[in-house]
């Protein structure tokens, strides 16, 4: 397998003959021996005349380019629960990985679902009325739900980034994010993607509890943890599990203050 880079002017496409010719040269074989060719990155070069830079993976006919294996999600209705605090990106993908491992995610989110959250955000923008638990920071999808969904990371050492991109495509994002140098989902699509992730989690037996702010976490009698939440109607509910994943985001200061009061370990990102 080799990588080749081709350029073309904006508005023009690379022909199959051009691509296969470049692939044959890179692989050191004849045209008939060229196998698969896959676009892996597209970027704009605006230095001088604006052009596209297109990077392809190519291989011989005797080889195969490695494909993406679609994760299998298990039915977890009767599986061991794991509490996930927060329904932002970290919480959603933690829940998906729990499904892959046969564990039941119980997602507790202080804000509202993405549809109901829109009205609280609009009320804040139009009238200055703040719902402290449902706003730009809190609610399904996390703080970036109502952005244009730019996707970037400063680290390539903490997991398979392409797996995340494929997951977004699976749940409704454009396939262009797999190849664009600066991918973004789009403000019109992002809430749909977030909702589709929730539907998948629930269909496989996971749980979502919105409008549920965590007020206490304490060791349970059987070695696990009891998590107490306060609902929007003022009612308290306790959830129990052996394990908790804290995906509370940067704005949940009350959670960090709770940990500090209990003298539990806290460290900077």
Name these PLM-found stretches:
Residues 2-52, 56-146, 150-269:
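Residues forming the flavin
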């Amino acid at each position: 397998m080799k990588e080749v880079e081709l350029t073309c002017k904006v508005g023009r496409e690379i022909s199959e003959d051009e691509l296969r010719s470049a692939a044959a040269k890179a692989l050191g074989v004849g045209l008939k021996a060229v196998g698969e060719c896959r676009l892996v990155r597209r970027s704009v070069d605006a230095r001088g005349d604006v052009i596209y830079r297109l990077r392809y993976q190519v291989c011989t006919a005797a080889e195969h380019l490695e494909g993406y294996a679609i994760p299998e999600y298990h039915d977890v209705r009767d599986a061991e629960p794991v509490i996930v605090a927060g329904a932002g990106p970290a919480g959603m993908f933690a829940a998906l990985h729990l499904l892959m491992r046969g564990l039941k995610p119980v997602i507790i989110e202080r804000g509202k679902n993405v549809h109901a959250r829109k009205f609280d955000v609009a009320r804040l923008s139009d009238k200055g009325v703040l719902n402290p638990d449902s706003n730009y920071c809190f609610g399904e999808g996390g703080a970036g739900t109502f952005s244009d969904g730019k996707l970037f990371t400063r680290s390539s050492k903490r997991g398979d980034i392409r797996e995340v991109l494929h997951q977004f495509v699976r749940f409704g994002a454009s396939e262009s994010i797999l190849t664009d140098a600066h991918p973004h989902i789009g403000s019109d699509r992002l809430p749909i993607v977030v909702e589709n992730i929730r539907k998948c989690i629930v269909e496989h037996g996971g749980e979502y509890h919105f409008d549920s702010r965590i007020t206490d976490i304490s060791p349970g009698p059987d070695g696990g943890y009891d998590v107490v939440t306060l609902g929007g109607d003022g009612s308290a509910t306790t959830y129990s599990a052996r394990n908790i994943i804290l995906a509370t985001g940067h704005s949940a200061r009350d959670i960090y203050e709770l940990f500090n009061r209990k003298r539990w370990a806290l460290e900077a990102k």
